[in-house]
Structure formats: C-alpha cells, structure tokens
Amino acid sequence: PFDAPGVIKGQGTIGTEINRQLKDIHAVFVPVGGGGLISGVAAYFTQVAPHTKIIGVEPYGAASMTLSLYEGHRVKLENVDTFADGVAVALVGEYTFAKCQELIDGMVLVRNDGISAAIKDVYDEGRNILETSGAVAIAGAAAYCEFYNIKNENIVAIASGANMDFSKLHKVTELAELGSDNEALLATFMIEQPGSFKTFAKLVGSMNITEVTYRFTSERKEALVLYRVDVDEKSDLEEMIKKLNSSNMKTFNFSHNELVAEHIKHLVGGSASISDEIFGEFIFPEKAGTLSTFLEAFSPRWNITLCRYRDQGDINGNVLVGFQVPQSEMDEFKSQADGLGYPYELDNSNEAFNIVVAE
C-alpha cells in the first residue's frame, strides 16, 4: 500500500499538521519503511517550505532505501532486521523510490541501541513508551544533530507506529543505556588467584557496576568478567580501562557490539578450544517447533557446540549457533543451511568470538 499515490497523499497531510504547529523548521526526520510517509511529507514541504530539509531514517539492518539511493536503483535486501518491524521492508516502492530520489535531502542510519535509547528519552521526558519503529526518527534526529553540532534550531521527528510489544521491553531496556552511552559493556580477563576479583573491584573504583558475570576459565588459568558500569564521563571510563590494562587485566569495550549484548554476555562457561568450529546467526519465525526443526537439519551430521536463543517479541527470532564443520564439508554444510530457507550469516570475524567464546 505504501507505493500508491493516494496513500502517499494521505500520509503527506502529516506535513500539513507539522507546518500548522511550527514554522521555520530546520529539518524533519521521517522513519522510512517502504517510503510512502517520507514521499508524502517531502512533497508537501517542497511546495510550502522548500528550505526545510527532509531526512529519512532507517535501522542499519533494514536500510533498503538508503542502499537503493546509493546504488541509484531499487535494491532488495536479502536479510532484514525486524527489531523495528514497522520499517522492516526488504524492497522499497517503485514510485516512492523515484520520489525520494527527487525530493529528500538525505538518509540517516541508526543502530538498535540508538533506537532503544530514543525510547528511553521519550519515556523520561513525557512518560510515553514508543514502539521501536516509532522511535527510529527520534534516534536519527539525535544522531544527526550531535554529528553536525546543530543547536538552537527547530527540529521535528515523526513518531509513527502503534504501541510497544510488551515482550520486547526487556530487550529495549537492555540496549537503551548502552545506546545513550550511560552504560558500558566490558570484558576483563584476570589471572585467577585468591584476591584477584577483589583487586578488580578496587580498580573499577567509584564507577557503579550494574551487572556482572564472573567465570573461571581453567584452560587459560584466567577468570573472565563480563560486566556493565554506569558512565557519567567518557574520560572516567577510558581511565578505568587504562588502569585495568596496566594492571595485567586485559579489558575490552563491547558497548556497541550487539552480538555481545544479545548473546555472548549470557555464555558464562568461558572459552573452548574446538577444532573446525564456526559460528552463525540464523533468523527464523518465532513459532512453536521452529527451533527443533532448525536443529534437526544439522544434528547429528555436524556437532552443535553452542546455542543461544531467546524469544524477543519480534516477528523473527535470532539464534547464535556454533558447529564443528571440517573445511572439506563446508560446501555441504552451506547447502544444507540454504535449504532451510532462513536468513543466516556465518561470521567468525567478530572479535568477541575469539576473545570470549573461542580459544
């Protein structure tokens, strides 16, 4: 429906409402799914206030319009992140794409933690809880104004969408503090000996630890600490990490590594040295029996070395899985994975795999 001229005209009336309530607007930020809303708003402001910038906002994992504008033609995404499901569109409309090429001033991409931080900001300000797609434009406006140091200008962000899905709240709260840089997610390795954890706590000092997972790793004779701390000043965090590293406690900042935030921080068993181990993230519909069907496709043919899954209240679920697959069988494995029809990505390049999970 977003590619119909009548629908676009109807959505364009939002521009009329904005213009009635506020004049001399520097920029209007619009969430982009199929492109109907931004096409209508841009068409209106081009006629009545051409000085106002119209900027679209998409999640990194659903950037179909951004990629299409960059390539100069419509591009269909193979995988679409459904965290902000209201704007999770694989292919933008033909008519809306042409309108965006002609009328809009740019696009901004936002991470899921930035969207979550925007939801928290709106709640703190007015006790309203937006759904994820409804907060996309606010996250984009905040990122844009920070990057370009825009102050003392009238900025509008369109908060579209319905009500928050209750089952998604826990993930939003997990990501919100990280997205606003009010918390940091860290991993520290320390030599395991009596008193070492106490020394670690002293080095963290006055920074408040809001979550901690501590696990002795016998193969390395080291303990792994995964933890979150409140951050008032970025310089304080940097100084703390510097003190830990100089005390032979190697520390990594994973604050904006969504793989760690979503999966790896829950894997407290330490690292393992497993030959031919590969890791993959698979996306499949959240319905009864899907996980069992997924696992049956690989086991016992290939040994499953790791599995982490949690219902997030999305249309689709995200599961992190480890497999033992000899290089000689990789083509066969990929063929089996392709046959399932679920989007997936095999990726051992994320530094968190090698630091926290793999030996």
UniProtKB/Swiss-Prot annotation:
Molecular function terms from GO: pyridoxal phosphate binding; threonine deaminase activity
Pathway where this protein functions: Amino-acid biosynthesis; L-isoleucine biosynthesis; 2-oxobutanoate from L-threonine: step 1/1
PANTHER family registered for this protein in UniProt: THREONINE DEHYDRATASE 2 BIOSYNTHETIC, CHLOROPLASTIC (PTHR48078:SF10), THREONINE DEHYDRATASE, MITOCHONDRIAL-RELATED (PTHR48078)
InterPro entries on file: ACT-like_dom_sf (IPR045865), Ser/Thr_Dehydratase (IPR050147), TD_ACT-like (IPR001721), TD_ACT-like_sf (IPR038110), TrpB-like_PALP (IPR001926), TrpB-like_PALP_sf (IPR036052)
EC number, as in UniProt: 4.3.1.19
Protein known as: Threonine dehydratase biosynthetic, chloroplastic
Pfam families listed in its UniProt record: PALP (PF00291), Thr_dehydrat_C (PF00585)
Subunit structure: Homotetramer.
